[in-house]
Amino acid sequence: MAEIDRWSNLHPDLLYQITEHLYSYHDYIRLRLVCKEWNSKLSSIPNHKRNPWLLLPGTTHDSSLSHILEKEQIYHVMFPDFDINDNLIRGSCHGWLITVVISEGAIRMLNPFTKTHIDLPPVSTFPDVVRYHPDRHGDEYVLVDLYNDVIYNLDAISFHKYEIQKIVISSPPDNDDFMAVAIYKECGKLAVCKLNDKRWTHIPTEQMSTFFQDVIFFQDKIYALDDDTSLYEFDKKVIMDELGKKPRPQLVPLLTSIGGMCEAPPPAKLTMYYTCSMNKYVIGCVDGSLLMIVKHNDWAMEMLHVCNKFDVFKLNKNSKEWSRMHSLEDYAVMIGYNSSVQMFPGKSPYCKRNHIYYTDNQVVLHTLGKPSLQDMGILNLEDTNTNEILPNVEWVCPPTWLLP
């Protein structure tokens, strides 16, 4: 008994130092199970290790089985109320998955580690919805085209499938300044919400034709990248203040204090390419700079594309010009449906420096409702070799990178 007491009375600082030498989530869980005191002292999610995990949604209808792959280890996480065929993954941030429930239009945040969920405002509350009639089967939505103001009708299932391109969150939902931002519509517009908001609010831009491909939260700003690789910056605090006004605005006002297009023009090299065949991602770095990752795609067969190559550009803090990068040095990046992030692998055996971890985020392909191949892998920038991940497996719900 005295031996057990010595373990349970271990100082929290020393216990935390032990966790710093654990790179496997499996080992971390086993450490928490040593005794009740350790289980209560250690959080359910390790907050010091950020290894990229690949979430592989199961394919069965009535058992919502997810597999988290960490090198050779696979962890099984059960969500009793999660139907793979009725959910679209549209984001992964801070250990949370963001999904759209096709049948009802709910937008749900799921935590695979704690098995908790939180709802964001539903799809029916997006700014392009004029009216929603849930009882009008096949004609539930009256919508407005934000580009030319044309009014049209659409059935609920189609709208729920195609409305959301991607959602990222600023922090875990228990933070007071929590905010979510969505890229929505085929034309790639931005909308935001706070926790407990009833609806989404549009963020306007001076350029009506702007088509955003990626968005992140970084240093109290929202950065968004459009299909022409133009960078936009918005002030998160100013937007939060606008959302807190009474009555609640239908859209964030087009104010200079909100932000807009940055002065840094797109990299000249990219003007040579047909930009629609690219996926663009923006990433915040620990030194305050921004990275732009451009993924070039080749169409291998009908409704399937594969990565051809990557271009990496860097925008230093206070700079107005992107510079070409040939190395990520001691860092790695992770892109896809997840919030685009930079990682420091350190000595971790599960994450390698100077590598790009990528998954597919082709929204149109993923809303067809049938299994399909996914373009995902790990690229070594040093020798440009790519390790494809499960290239011959078809998925109903696309795999997604996840950071605890």
Pin down the residues of each PLM region.
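C-terminal closing repeat unit and adjoining cap/tail of repeat-based domains
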Residues: E3-I4, H67-E70, F82, L88-G91, ...
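CRL adaptor-proximal regions
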Residues: M1-L10
